[in-house]
Structure formats: C-alpha cells, structure tokens
Amino acid sequence: MKKLPIFLLICLLIGIVACKETEDYWTQYEQWRETNESWFIEQLGAKDEKGNPIYTKVVPSWDHSIYVLMKYYNDTSLNRDAQSPYQTSTVDVIYKGMLYDGTPFDSSYLRTDSIYRTQVKQNIKGWIIALEQMKVGDSC
C-alpha cells in the first residue's frame, strides 16, 4: 500500500517534466517565417513574359487578414459561368502540394485513387479560400 503514493508521485513528476515548454514556436520557426514571407512578397510582383501577374491574390470575404496566392493553369474566362463550391460542398480534387522551393510534401497521386474527395470546410484555411474561389474545371 505504501508503494501507491510513491508511484503516483513518480507519475506526477514525469507529467510535469513532459509538459515543460522547451522553446517558443515563434522563435523556433523565425527563419522559416521570414523566408516564406519574402517568397510571398516576391511572387506578388512576379510577371509572366507578357507582363501579366503570375499569381492572383485572393482574400476571403470572411477574414480580410489572410490571403492565398493562386496560379491558374487554365483560361479562367472559359469557366466564368461554372459553379463554385460552398464551404458545405463536397468536391473531388487532384492535387500536388509543394513548398515554395518546389519540394513536394503531399500529393493525391500517391494514393490508390488519385482523386481526393472532401468537404470544403474540412480543410486548412488556405485550401478553403482557394476552393471557394475556383470554378468547376479550374486548374491551379
């Protein structure tokens, strides 16, 4: 019976040590943040060979403090009358996620079925913003 309090004390000490904060994430990822922000600013001003912006800055109506950069690979004027999904819509997406330096980090092509079916609102904010902006048939 005397072993139970000692066991509980050891568990408490392990819990305290395990929960100790080691480093502030803001400081830990400072270099990554600065590189990422520099890339975004550079891309906002990037132009193609005809002088047109390469990326479109998209700010959602529901939060003006965030935005995404979208690069369309198709002629969006051809899909102008097509439907856009709502946050409650279910969409089929084929995607390849890449870091700013072109390093791939995720892809639907790595799955058995390359189509990723999801409800728009179940994704990260960047995807929600982009998907709500896209029309059926768009490629970004």
Role assignments for model-derived ranges:
Residues 1-19:
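Sec-dependent bacterial lipoprotein signal peptides
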